[in-house]
């Protein structure tokens, strides 16, 4: 009986991870559509080992989401909708809080938008240089 319960927990966790992957894929698409940029400016990476999701973006997105009120509000509202979390904007950091812990979902998720330029070659090549880290606690 104990093994069955453990298996169900693993399946639930896997389903939760799949949900987050789908939700962030949709977020990425909506951000690209909203900014009306023909080429892709956002991509995401989910690391199952660290359980962290990264949304990578170009400098244009890094500037737009904070400086264009409509873009900022749209992203915040969409994140509220897909995450089921209360979302608070604190400067460049979005803080998610969830009232009830469930299926290992942390009570607080900090989403930190930051420009992260590794070297000038990446910048000149137009590579993705920023990332949004979801830090679970």
Curated annotation (Swiss-Prot):
Keywords: Host cytoplasm, Late protein, Virion
Cystine pairings recorded for this chain: none
Cell location: Virion; Host cytoplasm
Cellular component, GO, one term: host cell cytoplasm
Record's note on what induces expression: Expressed in the late phase of the viral replicative cycle.
Primary localization class, coarse: virion
Purpose: Plays a role in the inhibition of the host innate immune response. Mechanistically, promotes the autophagy-mediated lysosomal degradation of host TBK1 and affects IRF3 nuclear translocation to block type I IFN production.
Family: Belongs to the asfivirus A137R family.
Subunit structure: Interacts with host TBK1.
UniProt protein name: Structural protein A137R
Organism this protein belongs to: African swine fever virus (isolate Warthog/Namibia/Wart80/1980) (ASFV)
